[in-house]
């Protein structure tokens, strides 16, 4: 059973929520994107290598 004290009141004062900076999602996203961007940069750089 839910009571009215559990629900936020519309228009009432709300407490600011502090979220952690590093989360599992943040680590997973950056563990994939950082090497991907590095790899794409390496591929782009290799296009300018002259024989």
Curated annotation (Swiss-Prot):
Compartments in which it is found: Cell inner membrane
Cofactor(s) the protein needs: heme b
GO-annotated molecular function: electron transfer activity; heme binding; iron ion binding
Record keywords, A-Z: Cell inner membrane, Cell membrane, Electron transport, Heme, Iron, Membrane, Metal-binding, Photosynthesis, Photosystem II, Transmembrane, Transmembrane helix, Transport
Cross-referenced InterPro entries: PSII_cyt_b559_bsu (IPR006241), PSII_cyt_b559_CS (IPR006216), PSII_cyt_b559_N (IPR013081)
Entry annotated with the keyword 4Fe-4S: no
GO BP annotations, alphabetical order: photosynthetic electron transport chain
Zinc-finger found in the keyword field: no
Cofactor binding description: With its partner (PsbE) binds heme. PSII binds additional chlorophylls, carotenoids and specific lipids.
A GO CC term attached to the entry: cytoplasm
Residue ranges crossing the lipid bilayer per the database entry: 26-42
Main location: membrane
Residues annotated as binding heme: 30
Role this protein plays: This b-type cytochrome is tightly associated with the reaction center of photosystem II (PSII). PSII is a light-driven water:plastoquinone oxidoreductase that uses light energy to abstract electrons from H(2)O, generating O(2) and a proton gradient subsequently used for ATP formation. It consists of a core antenna complex that captures photons, and an electron transfer chain that converts photonic excitation into a charge separation.
Alphabetized HAMAP family for the sequence: PSII_PsbF (MF_00643)
Assembly and oligomerization: Heterodimer of an alpha subunit and a beta subunit. PSII is composed of 1 copy each of membrane proteins PsbA, PsbB, PsbC, PsbD, PsbE, PsbF, PsbH, PsbI, PsbJ, PsbK, PsbL, PsbM, PsbT, PsbX, Psb30/Ycf12, peripheral proteins PsbO, CyanoQ (PsbQ), PsbU, PsbV and a large number of cofactors. It forms dimeric complexes.
Family affiliation: Belongs to the PsbE/PsbF family.
NCBIfam families: cyt_b559_beta
Name the UniProt record assigns to this protein: Cytochrome b559 subunit beta
């Amino acid at each position: 059973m839910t009571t009215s004290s559990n629900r936020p009141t519309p228009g009432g004062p709300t407490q600011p929520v502090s979220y952690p900076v590093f989360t599992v999602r943040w680590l997973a996203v950056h563990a994939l994107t950082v090497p991907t961007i590095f790899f794409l940069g390496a591929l782009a750089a290799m296009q300018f290598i002259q024989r």
